[in-house]
Design a protein with these regions (language model features):
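Acidic/His-rich structured neighborhood in mature extracellular/periplasmic domains
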Residues: 2-144, 151, 157-160
Length: 161
């Protein structure tokens, strides 16, 4: 990770896109760190910390000792910016009453955050049934802003589709 120009460029363009849709979005300070293989992205106080040790590639030998193959495939350079956006947006738009929500509502909340990350990235990185449900909903309801989508924690309107 001696050169992170590609990551910086994608972070900048992604946050520029987000600012178009969410003008009040605070732009975080971003730093890189070496962790203890226990966290990939650390978010707090308008900062994002990228633990580079969690993005050393799917062939990094130490990962095989501690992680499942499904986890290892996400531990690549290509996942850094999507993960930064995902965890940062989750910190700003948490799900209220998480414990009392159904699994479907929880999945839709994550799908909503991932859908917005895809918009910010400018390409479809996150793909799931729930991201598709949000995409269908937003295509049918073009008057709903991305900011309002993120602020709304009522998923009954999507579940009924």
């Amino acid at each position: 990770y001696a050169n992170m120009d590609d990551i910086n460029k994608l972070l900048n363009s992604s946050f520029d896109r987000l600012k178009v849709y969410i003008p009040t979005l605070p732009i975080p300070q971003i730093y890189a760190q070496i962790g203890a293989l226990d966290q990939s992205i650390v978010v707090g106080n308008q900062t994002i910390g990228i633990s580079l040790d969690k993005y050393l590639g799917k062939d990094y030998p130490l990962y095989k000792k501690y992680y499942y193959p499904s986890q290892i495939k996400t531990m690549t350079r290509d996942n850094i910016v999507p993960d930064c956006l995902n965890f940062y947006l989750l910190s700003l738009y948490p799900m209220h009453d998480f414990e009392s929500r159904t699994q479907l509502e929880r999945d839709l909340h994550i799908g909503k955050i991932m859908w917005v990350c895809n918009i910010a990235l400018g390409y479809k990185f996150f793909k799931s049934r729930y991201v598709n449900m949000i995409d269908q909903y937003m295509n049918k309801n073009k008057s709903i802003s991305i900011e309002n989508l993120l602020k709304n924690n009522d998923y009954s309107y999507i579940i009924k589709m």
